[in-house]
Amino acid sequence: PVVAIFRGTVDTFLDALIILGAGILVLVYLFADLGGLSLDVKSVDALLYKNWFWWGLDLVADGLVLIYVAGSWYLLATIITGQKLFMENVARAALMLELLVSWMVWSHHLLADQGQPEMMKLISGEMVTAFELLTQGLALFITLVTLWKARPLKMTNELKYLLGGLIGFGLAVPAGIIQADMAMNRVLHNTQWIIGAHVHIAIIVGLYMTLYSAVYVLWPHVTNNAKLWSQKLANTHFWLHLIGGIGMGAFMGMAGLDGMLRRHMYFNGEFDLMMILAGVCGAMVLLAWIIFLFNIIMSIGLKGLIGIFLPSKNKESSYGI
């Protein structure tokens, strides 16, 4: 976890610099145009700008999300099992390898860009990107083996949601590798596959369920061992979120395979069935969140909820805040 924090912090700093610089350039041209000053757009190389922008923005997904999530898996697995992480040295090495990988994979966003050099598409966009299947696959494997070696384990909320997070990334990462193939990208580029099968499942299932696991690990520490109001609601939340999140991404991905573009309006009902099914699954995720929120509020009570935002009467409990 400490290595993951260090790794993620490096990419956070770099990402902030790159995106800030890219954004300032846009604002310069925007305000100049509003002020009646016409700047020469050709003075900025469009291809260089796109590479600069995607190098920075890609650090968010390929550097920050994957690394912070992997670090969270390791921490959660050791807390849940009470045992040392399996292959701890390899886990550290994989996190550091991802540092280099995340800096060199941005071209997978430019595989359909005609101006992007073909060699950069092949090496950065396809070959180096494939290493993320190795680095994240190692993180998933190490976490699962750590849990396996500690069996029998009680299927607690934190364990269930951790497994749900592993399932999410176990589906989303290969979906991303598939679309990072130069041939498959011809079919999948800018379609609902990208935002559905890859992004939605990674974030809604992989990231969110990992965070829910962390919530249940922290629950007794931040509530003075308050009892969860309803375990049945916690179970309902789990299944609705898992099935709804995977279903939403899957149906969007199926529409993408049939050619449905993202950021595009369709008026003739070509993809209505898949979008309706994706919408139903999305509603399941929303309902799951409402159930989770209701269960949390009922567990701490309205007085406890309001008390979160009030100063503590115990001076020691708020020391340093």
What does each of the following model-derived ranges do?
Residues 1-2, 11-40, 54-81, 88-111, ...:
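Hydrophobic cores of alpha-helical transmembrane segments in multi-pass integral membrane proteins
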Residues 43-55, 188-193:
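Juxtamembrane membrane-water interface segments that cap and precede transmembrane helices
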Residues 226:
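Catalytic-face loop-and-helix region of soluble metabolic enzyme cores
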Residues 113-118, 185-189, 262-265:
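Membrane-interface helix termini and inter-helical loops of multi-pass transporters
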Residues 118-119, 140:
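Glycine/proline-enriched, intrinsically flexible loops and inter-domain linkers
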Residues 152-153, 159:
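Cytosolic-side membrane-entry/anchor segment at the start of a transmembrane helix
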